[in-house]
Amino acid sequence: MFAPIVRQHPGPALVTSTKPDLFELSATERVRRGPVRVLDPDRLAPSGTRVRWSPVAGCEDSRVAERRAQALVAASGDDTGSTAQFFRQSAADVLKGYLHAAALDGRTMRDVLAWSARPTDPTPMRILAENPGTAVDWAGTIGTHTSGAEQTTSGVMRTLARALACFGHSDVMEMCCPAPGEQFDVDEFLASSATVYLLGKQPSAGAGGVAPLLTAFAEELLDAAERVAAGRSGRRLDPPLLALLDEAPSICPIPSLPQRLADGRGRGVVVMYGMQSPAQARDRWGPNGAEAMNDATTVSVILRGLRSVDDLEDLERLCGQCRIQRHSKSDSVGGRSVTVASELEPVVTVAEIRSLEVGVGLVLWDDFPQVLAYLPGLWEDRKGWKAISVEEAATRAANDAARHPAALTRILVE
């Protein structure tokens, strides 16, 4: 469903996915439009040109440090309970201080990770206390959360460790500590028709995963899009930026997504997102955030496979009712009579929504009546699919070769 959109978009594109398929189906076409890069800590598409990006860059600005810390920590768990929220907010308060201190003192994510492993290390607090450009009392905030009651402190630092877990891998850390001149240029990206793919596996239960890194990068890019749009004619990007967030709750749960959906279109930022069910949005952004996302989403496409009875019933009610006339005939001594009864029935039932045909979507668009739409796959364009399938196979082979170079060498030798 998403591949044709990515292939045809005329402007810059930010694309997320938990599988390499979307990259393999669209990357070759995107190269024809502009540079293609991947932020791919799990090596789902290792043949792609890698993004080098430092989460510390720009954090001399306390507002940037705060937003980046929020994005990193928010993506580390989907428990919306009050205790979990307290620990996440406290961890973000510590992390924003670490990022701010690292940027002010010319340090890197290696230092941030080291400080998080040694909460009693006074270095970040000293940097903040001695630097006149620091935010007000962020050093004290770090001290409050790292030297308080043991149970509270351990909870905060466990949450922080989960948010930074992916940086413990040497290849990921190397990716996030670019040399001078290697840092991903966001402004250059937005001025082109380039593409960046953010790829990562679904995190397993209890694991930190790569979602924090991908989310922080996406948030940075969308923040930059708003800034650049403000200086453009009409205060919007033209052509627009496409932010296509497949599996958004799992791999790229941008904290500000509800707000981005509400006002992105006016800035030339087209946000599309995919999820398994509405319940995922409630788990990740909370009931209020999920409701705000739903209200700000102009077009919703529901595909087969939804299993939650509550969600199915909500959709049935949303589609409304229609009046049906039923005719019944009866014979009697006096002759035949016809009775007409009028009843209200759902336009689309729970059973019909749950068992939609493959390739058919229930489309809800603003206040227009819902429709069932056929969504043709790329393969149905026989002429075009022949070329696309060749491109896909070549990209997949390149990925396989990059994952297993030794095996490829043996095959060539034999």
Predicted features, each with a name:
Residues E29-R32, P55, P287-A290, E316-G320, ...:
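Short secondary-structure boundary/capping segments
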Residues M1-V269, A351-L372, R382, A387-E414:
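P-loop NTPase motor domains
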Residues L261-W365:
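Conserved ATP-driven motor cores of ASCE-family P-loop NTPases powering translocation/secretion/packaging/pilus
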